[in-house]
Amino acid sequence: MDTSELFSRWTATCQEIQAAAAACGRSADDVTLIAVSKFHPLEAITALAARGQIDFGENYLQEAQEKIAGCQQNVRWHFIGHLQSKKASATAGNFALIHGVDSVKLAQRLQRDRKSVV
């Protein structure tokens, strides 16, 4: 997908969020758009970040770590999808939010690992 198509889709999505929020008497600021960036190059992420997109979602840890390390923009990373217990330590220090925690044991491990990183 080229940059102009990416911007066009992102802009359309933002407009849909604004319209939906207005229709139910809410502010679009109450909604967080997480741009799923898996399989997209770092250049696309930095281009959207430059336009104001802050939240990005990844579900492949190795790919995400490369992007996080290379990203100079002020973004907030989300881990989306299933998280394996063996990847909890690496995930805890790289992501602001982790979606899809499916057990208390995993949540406790993330909490412990997060404390050791912070």
Task: Give the ranges of each region predicted by the language model.
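Conserved small/polar residues in nucleotide/adenosyl-binding loops
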Residues: K115-V118
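Active-site-adjacent structural elements in enzyme catalytic cores
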Residues: L110
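Charged, compositionally biased N-terminal leader segments and the immediate start
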Residues: M1-R26
